[in-house]
Design a protein with these regions (language model features):
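Short, charged, surface-exposed secondary-structure boundary motifs
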Residues: 17-21
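Interdomain hinge/linker elements that couple catalytic modules in large macromolecular machines
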Residues: 23-176
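A cross-kingdom feature that marks ATP-driven nucleic-acid transaction machinery
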Residues: 140, 146-221
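Residue-level detector of secondary-structure boundary/capping sites
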Residues: 9, 47, 98-99, 184, ...
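Short, glycine/charged-enriched secondary-structure capping and boundary segments
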Residues: 1-4, 23-25, 183-184
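Secondary-structure boundary/capping positions in well-ordered alpha/beta enzyme cores
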Residues: 4, 131, 200-204
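A short helix-turn-beta junction within AAA+ P-loop NTPase domains corresponding to the substrate/partner-engaging
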Residues: 2-16
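Conserved catalytic core of Hanks-type protein kinase domains
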Residues: 12, 59, 196
């Protein structure tokens, strides 16, 4: 379909977009640099119009996907789409035999429940019973399917063969759906941070903080 179809990756709703839908107001877009350097001024202006924290937990639970406007049972919807992605999209795109689907599901669940977010390929290999190379492949399949976010120590686009330093569930709605009531709040906030910044910023691993943004800002969440 090259030359016939234009491909476009559409991210989920940002917290700003969610607030606009919920309040029927329009809020300005700020760059990350603006938020770091002018955060007090920005917060003061926003609080004149809305109290974001009143909407924050709802966003973490169901606000990333606009389907929440129509779908009342958002947990069921998210779990159904996770299963569709694992059982149909990834096998079709990556030629995985159906008998290995349980391994993909195990790996996603382990990733969601690991509050350290560290990547131990040997341990994961033993837990799901596949080779180290297969674990790396599975992680990249789920990254491409937007189920996981993988962090490397560089921002090289050709990192698919490298071991990631950290892994996170792609967004807080997915994390809440997989873990239900047993969600670590720190990991949830990190997943939120990545879901907001990854579409427009370069996020890499750093030993000196949780994230390195655009090679310049070290952020601890």
């Amino acid at each position: 379909l090259k030359g016939i179809v234009d491909m476009y990756n559409l991210s989920g709703l940002s917290f700003r977009e969610f607030l606009e839908l919920e309040t029927n107001q329009t809020f300005p877009v700020y760059s990350f640099a603006d938020m770091v350097e002018r955060h007090e001024e920005i917060v003061e202006d926003i609080l004149k119009h809305v109290r974001p924290l009143a909407y924050f937990n709802n966003y973490l639970e169901y606000g990333y996907y606009p389907i929440y406007l129509e779908e009342k049972s958002h947990i069921d919807y998210l779990l159904k789409n996770i299963n569709l992605t694992l059982e149909f999209d990834i096998p079709y795109a990556s030629q995985i035999e159906l008998k290995y689907l349980v391994k993909l599901k195990q790996l996603l669940y382990i990733a969601a429940k690991d509050n350290t977010c560290n990547v131990n390929i040997s341990k994961l290999s033993g837990l799901i019973g596949v080779s180290r190379a297969t674990v790396l492949n599975y992680l990249n399949y789920m990254k491409n399917a937007r189920l996981l976010t993988l962090l490397y120590d560089t921002d090289n686009d050709d990192d698919c063969g490298k071991k990631p330093k950290k892994l996170y569930i792609h967004n807080p709605n997915l994390l809440n759906a997989v873990c239900l009531e047993d969600v670590d709040t720190t990991v949830l906030r990190k997943s939120f941070f990545l879901s907001q910044l990854c579409p427009m910023s370069r996020i890499t691993y750093t030993e000196r903080a949780d994230f390195l943004v655009d090679g310049k800002y070290r952020i601890a969440v």
